[in-house]
Amino acid sequence: MDYPTMTLAEIEAMPVAGVADKDAHLYLWTINRYVEQAYSVARAWGFRPVCLLTWAKTPRGLGLGGAFVQTTEHILFARRGTLKALRREPSTWWNWTRPEAGTGPKHSRKPEDFQTLVEAVSPGPRLELFARRARPGWTVWGNEVEANK
């Protein structure tokens, strides 16, 4: 990886429960290999898992091993308290365009359309952990973002 990683225990120990509102939504990105752990993290942070959302990416070659080419990433949607959604979304999967960085895709970069979806479904305030860029109306935290703007 071209960025530092954390263990499951380190992620579960993050003080998210202490900074999230008592009524809040959580959108937790994961990949197929770590779906079970995502549920554990959500619960450790005081959230109740509700459903798994899927980003179905257009394939780009065969990638690394296994019987199936990994062309999906997932977002575990979880709730804490009774925060109502702003609208009901008619799908749990999307084929968003892959974000590009320079001459090609950047590993782990998430599509802007995802944040637009969050803004349409979940009331603020909004916090993004491990952010790569600032976004108006969001508080961001991450070692790749310059400052919260």
List the model feature ranges, each with a label.
Residues 1-149:
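Class I S-adenosyl-L-methionine-dependent methyltransferase catalytic core
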